[in-house]
């Protein structure tokens, strides 16, 4: 079947009032960015829905696949757009029915927005259904539980006919809900946390702490790949890579072993707080899950949060681990997250970390050494990468260059 348009239905932005135009315009920009570098389409954003006009050479499956990841889209339908001509309506519906399996059932559903159209809803349903049965005797009508449903929308500008409704990502268009800094560890949880806030329209930049030579280049590439997967859904993401080796070594020198994890998280939060102000973000996001590990009890969170006045969002706080894993698999981050490359949170993990840290002891241990200069130095030496869905690591680029030289 040759479709000439895609009908894109909006998600929650349909609930917006005076700001609706801003949400629609942002979604239109996000759609255009998601479809780069594809060709053969033209995007038209309207108040109640979006239409994407397709030329014959357009790769409709690839376009739909990309659109299905764009937040703010409820669903997508390949449609046939025709003039308000009854014979054309019949012929287009008959063409759709040719793809139905032999022995299957169907119904015709009509939405008549243009009340001036000659036939009313029921008359058009009967006319089109009769035309289909006349041309295709391998299928029958079932209005209660059909295998297929041909939908006809009689709108003011034209008539749209379709059968498939493909689920979108839902949520709100990214870019309409402020900016956050995601603490991206490389594990299962933090990429999912990032996606959860993106789905609410929030723009995300990511921060990752690495401690060479204790953490490997492969661990760094793993985080870059996770960022690339996230970028498939929202466009380019800035990844801030923080050199954290010296701070971790100093923590292990002066802080009681049971408290090193608490102090490590506090130093990460202090650095994140500074980056938040540099990039004009509104909050910090992490993948913490209540009670999952020692640093994620309420007392630990209190001690860690104490170093910043910036709001810390924890989208996964009360989810079961199984639910988080399920989300990670659906998003395509799980297989990358479980690659066995240690991050800086695991390499110095004490055997018996405190789960209920005494706040006064935390302050006492950290007061032995002034970490301010080390923190400033780490911030000054941050490496920032802009990662899009086509980004390749330095190793991959080197391999590509070598292959090119060989051939």
UniProtKB/Swiss-Prot annotation:
One of its GO terms (cellular component) is cytosol. It is found in: Cytoplasm. Pathway: Cofactor biosynthesis; thiamine diphosphate biosynthesis. It catalyses: [ThiI sulfur-carrier protein]-S-sulfanyl-L-cysteine + a uridine in tRNA + 2 reduced [2Fe-2S]-[ferredoxin] + ATP + H(+) = [ThiI sulfur-carrier protein]-L-cysteine + a 4-thiouridine in tRNA + 2 oxidized [2Fe-2S]-[ferredoxin] + AMP + diphosphate; [ThiS sulfur-carrier protein]-C-terminal Gly-Gly-AMP + S-sulfanyl-L-cysteinyl-[cysteine desulfurase] + AH2 = [ThiS sulfur-carrier protein]-C-terminal-Gly-aminoethanethioate + L-cysteinyl-[cysteine desulfurase] + A + AMP + 2 H(+). Its EC number is 2.8.1.4. Residues 61-165 form the THUMP domain. InterPro entries: Rossmann-like_a/b/a_fold, ThiI_AANH, ThiI_fer, ThiI_N, THUMP_dom, THUMP_ThiI, tRNA_STrfase, tRNA_sulfurtransferase_ThiI. ATP binds at residues 183-184, 208-209, 265, 287, 296. Keywords: ATP-binding, Cytoplasm, Nucleotide-binding, RNA-binding, Thiamine biosynthesis, Transferase, tRNA-binding. One of its GO terms (biological process) is tRNA 4-thiouridine biosynthesis. Its main location: cytoplasm. The keyword Transmembrane helix does not apply. PROSITE patterns: THUMP (PS51165). Belongs to the ThiI family. This is Probable tRNA sulfurtransferase.
